[in-house]
């Protein structure tokens, strides 16, 4: 948008420059204005010496109207002005000195004055003349030498206003102007009336999750909800820790009677009985079918009979008529407990039950045997006479601070490992007069190194600490390297070497 505004401003400026150029090009050059003098009027003239307002008869006025042609970007410019013309010239022109310019050859007299214009005294101001003329003769053709530049004439008085010209025709409608610059922001209007309620808008996007609010107060206890659907089978839980040794509980009550076992196997069929003798009663007529009798009460359960001998299959009897369905009988009394059935097939493995409650803590057990506590430690220092020990050899720590287990050998200045395990070793060395390079050595292998670059009478401290695993029979000592043996000790400064067992390895 700023580029469009700049283009509009440049176009407007260009239009103004073009209008000004065309306006200056179409203006006619004014003729010199006559000067009123006190000379006597010419013959045939009228009027006294005070006729300064009359124009000379030889000069006339001509109204010139210039109309600008319409262009694509400029409007119509109509200019009307009154120009004074010389009676010798046909139209207003610029000054010229070329011989080719044409002028009328006839002689103009005072009779050419405009009607109603009186003859007055006047004198031409030659400094404003465009042609080589004089008062007594008309100009002649030809090109004269250029004259010298005359002095500027006095300021002329403003002439009378000319006759207003006729109203010109309405010009063609110009093209629409460029868009103007945006106006300033208007004043804030009054608050309008409340509009009608709009339709419900689309639901907005969910906002950003706000910060978690403070924990609310405990609400009232809700009503018991409906029983939910059974949950899915959970994963197998971890094996619980064994409970404490609890006391033996009392004997429980007798459990409920278990369900009846499966039916026993069918016993072998007994032998057929002997056929009975025919009765004496002759065969009577077949009687009518009697009504179905009421079901009798269930009889007592019979005793289990002895298994019969395998008999032969008898002849199948005639198919009897189907009797009517009897009404169900009443519930009989529970029979006695039958003998236990055979052991059934083992069922599938049941699911793991919930973790039971923790058992009661059992009684305190008897005191065990006291374990043998393994100890191994030492702490030694350096006497002042053993300061600056020779390099490459164990430092002679002969000032015993602790060595109850006698695992430190003062003759060799070495620690002998008796109990395998993890040991802690540390040393604090006072350094003076010369630099120090010390190393913690295990079986001839340097495991830990320390360096302190010190010269002069300054005193410094060098220390280190490490955990090392040792086997039975390992030896540990401290030694200096090369000529950097600035180990120092005095009545006010000590250099110490300490070690102790942290964890002993379990016995095999």
Curated annotation (Swiss-Prot):
Protein's name according to its UniProt entry: Otolin-1
Sites carrying sugar chains: 121, 416
Disulfide topology: none
Compositional bias ranges of the Gly residues kind: 42-54, 326-341
Ranges annotated as biased composition (Basic and acidic residues): 188-197, 212-226
UniProt keyword Metal-binding, yes or no: yes
Source superkingdom: Eukaryota
Keyword annotations of the record: Calcium, Collagen, Disulfide bond, Extracellular matrix, Glycoprotein, Metal-binding, Secreted, Signal
UniProt record similarity statement: Belongs to the OTOL1 family.
Assembly description: Homooligomer; disulfide-linked; probably forms homotrimers. Interacts with otomp.
Domain Collagen-like: 144-367
């Amino acid at each position: 948008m700023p580029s469009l505004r700049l283009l509009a401003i440049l176009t407007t400026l260009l239009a103004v420059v073009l209008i000004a150029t065309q306006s200056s090009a179409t203006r006619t050059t004014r003729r010199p204005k006559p000067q009123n003098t006190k000379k006597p009027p010419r013959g045939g003239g009228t009027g006294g010496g005070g006729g300064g307002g009359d124009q000379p008869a030889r000069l006339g006025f001509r109204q010139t109207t210039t109309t600008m042609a319409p262009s694509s970007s400029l409007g119509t410019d109509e200019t009307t002005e009154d120009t004074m013309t010389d009676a010798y010239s046909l139209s207003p022109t610029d000054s010229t000195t070329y011989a080719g310019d044409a002028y009328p050859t006839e002689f103009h007299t005072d009779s050419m004055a405009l009607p109603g214009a009186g003859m007055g005294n006047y004198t031409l101001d030659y400094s404003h003349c465009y042609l080589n003329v004089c008062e007594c003769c008309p100009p002649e053709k030809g090109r004269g030498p250029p004259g010298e530049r005359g002095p500027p004439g006095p300021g002329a008085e403003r002439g009378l206003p000319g006759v207003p010209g006729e109203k010109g025709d309405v010009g063609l409608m110009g093209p629409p102007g460029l868009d103007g610059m945006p106006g300033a922001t208007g004043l804030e209007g009054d608050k309008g009336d409340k509009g009608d309620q709009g339709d419900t808008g689309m639901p907005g996007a969910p906002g950003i999750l706000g910060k978690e609010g403070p924990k609310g107060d405990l609400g009232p206890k809700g009503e018991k909800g409906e029983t939910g659907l059974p949950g899915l089978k959970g994963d197998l839980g971890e094996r619980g820790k064994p409970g404490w040794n609890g006391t033996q509980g009392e004997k429980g009550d007798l459990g409920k009677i278990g369900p009846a076992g499966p039916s026993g196997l069918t016993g072998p069929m007994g032998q057929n009985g002997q056929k009975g003798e025919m009765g004496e009663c002759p065969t009577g007529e077949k009687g009518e079918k009697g009504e179905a009798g009421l079901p009798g009460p269930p009889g007592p359960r019979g005793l289990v009979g002895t298994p019969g001998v395998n008999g032969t299959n008898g002849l199948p009897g005639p198919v009897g008529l189907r009797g009517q369905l009897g009404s169900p009988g009443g519930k009989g009394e529970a029979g006695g407990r039958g003998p236990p059935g055979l052991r059934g097939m083992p069922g599938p493995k049941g699911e793991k039950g919930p973790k039971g409650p923790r058992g009661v803590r059992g009684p305190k057990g008897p005191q065990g045997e006291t374990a043998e506590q393994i100890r191994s430690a030492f702490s030694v220092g350096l006497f002042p006479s053993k300061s600056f020990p020779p390099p490459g050899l164990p430092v002679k720590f002969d000032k015993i601070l602790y060595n109850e287990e006698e695992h430190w050998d003062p003759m060799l200045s070495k620690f002998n490992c008796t109990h395998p395990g993890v040991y802690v070793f540390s040393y604090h060395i006072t350094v003076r007069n010369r630099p120090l390079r010390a190393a913690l050595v295990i079986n001839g292998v340097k495991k830990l190194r320390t360096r302190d670059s010190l010269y002069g009478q300054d005193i410094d401290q060098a220390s280190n600490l490490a955990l090392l695993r040792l086997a039975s029979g390992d030896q540990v000592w401290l030694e200096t390297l090369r000529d950097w043996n600035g180990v120092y000790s005095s009545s006010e400064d000590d250099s110490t070497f300490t070690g102790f067992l942290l964890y002993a390895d379990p016995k095999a």
